[in-house]
Amino acid sequence: MIKWPWKVQESAHQTALPWQEALSIPLLTCLTEQEQSKLVTLAERFLQQKRLVPLQGFELDSLRSCRIALLFCLPVLELGLEWLDGFHEVLIYPAPFVVDDEWEDDIGLVHNQRIVQSGQSWQQGPIVLNWLDIQDSFDASGFNLIIHEVAHKLDTRNGDRASGVPFIPLREVAGWEHDLHAAMNNIQEEIELVGDNAASIDAYAASDPAECFAVLSEYFFSAPELFAPRFPSLWQRFCQFYQQDPLQRLHRTNDTDSFSATNVH
């Protein structure tokens, strides 16, 4: 029998966080009880160590806080919470937000423009999110804003900037880069055939190696059935890095559901 970490003494019941309800989102239903228990333990520590800051009138209750923490900790379920040491605050807007962006063109002219962002991950600063896209991250759909921004944080542990290559043994870097760029080229070829909106993998993955790693991390956890068969070699590298196999979880859950259906009388 599993001893759930959120089942506290009766005297402390009033302050217990709603972990069981927080776990009820589709993305987390494939986890075993042991994995869910481990994830909650990490999420409790995450909420103790990080500050969630609601902005522009957004209301942050305990259930929302728990679900945000669970999604932050899913990628580091086996890596450990220390992999999220690079920031202390999570800023949360109610919806996508406008930022001032500065960029330099091919001839060296600097341009400024205002753009709408869903999230940001500052190298030596906070992660910035918005609640509308966080809610869309609860489903197993291939989109997950929190996992995307966490992937950027994991990526930058390997150096000063995100490169698409997380902190892995040096002997594996060349193979990782080869498979990642092959995936980018494959996605770009599909985009050229069907267009950005019709591509089966988010077209943003073809824009940059760091974005490819972040986007495919979203698919790794929330749509493994799309990632694994298309890029099997890169899939194995992701499994080795994250020390998880979401496709195996999905198959296990589907097998359980099929068994239950055949035994209904």
Curated annotation (Swiss-Prot):
Gene Ontology biological-process annotations: proteolysis
Group of enzyme by EC: hydrolase
Pfam hit, one: Peptidase_M90
First-listed, main subcellular location of the protein, grouped into a coarse class: cytoplasm
Transmembrane intervals: none
EC number: 3.4.11.-
Keyword Hydrolase: yes
Subcellular location: Cytoplasm
One GO cellular component, as annotated: cytosol
UniProt key word Transport: no
Gene Ontology MF: a single term: aminopeptidase activity
Gene3D superfamilies for the chain: Collagenase (Catalytic Domain), Glucose-regulated metallo-peptidase M90, N-terminal domain
Annotated keywords: Aminopeptidase, Cytoplasm, Hydrolase, Metal-binding, Metalloprotease, Protease, Zinc
Stated role: Involved in the modulation of the activity of the glucose-phosphotransferase system (glucose-PTS). Interacts with the transcriptional repressor Mlc, preventing its interaction with DNA and leading to the modulation of expression of genes regulated by Mlc, including ptsG, which encodes the PTS system glucose-specific EIICB component.
Name recorded for this polypeptide: Mlc titration factor A
Species name: Escherichia coli (strain SMS-3-5 / SECEC)
Primary gene name: mtfA
